Amino acid sequence: IEKIFKDWYKRVDVIYGDMIIRRSDGVYYAKAQDLSHFENDFPLFHPSTFIARSVFVSHLFDVSYRISADFKLLRDVYYEHGKFLYLPFVFTNFDAIYGLSSSECALEILRERGRIYGKDKTVGWKFIYMIYSVNLKIKSLLKQILKFCSSSCYQRVIKMRVPNHLERIS
């Protein structure tokens, strides 16, 4: 890692890589996605991202975002044609069971992303937010019912919800 930073730190704004994610249903290798995904999602993992000091000085975190300040900063750098370097290397082992990565923060993340995309005041976005909120409540209720009724069925449902960029390793 030291050699990488010695060779690259003055030539790029952001170095990012992959990570291992521990979820309630297993351990996964998470490969960063193509940066074009910034249009709809967060294609890289902030724990596996190194940002040049000059970027922090020129962009600063927008602290009005409780959860998505890192997303906004990196998205802004990307759309300002910042230089990103992807390294196919696991920089982080990450626990996604608790904290901000848990599904309980999903609504706040969606709300903040709406602000970042500049869509949060539109009727369409408010409708999407309402549908998403109801969807999360229904999923939570169904998970509780499945856990109570059938452990094997619950495990199958959890496995179906694994994003494409995750590869199960245990």
Describe each PLM feature range.
Residues 1-28:
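Conserved donor NDP-sugar-binding/catalytic core segment of glycosyltransferases
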Residues 10, 82, 105, 122-123:
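Alpha-helical structural elements of signaling/regulatory helical domains
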Residues 118-170:
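Membrane-proximal basic amphipathic "stem/tether" segments
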Residues 8, 64, 166-170:
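Extended hydrophobic/Leu-rich segments
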Residues 13-15, 87-89, 126-128:
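A short coil-to-beta-strand element that immediately follows conserved catalytic motifs
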Residues 7, 116-119:
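Alpha-helical structural signal in soluble globular domains
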Residues 17, 23-112, 116:
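Conserved nucleotide-sugar donor-binding catalytic segment
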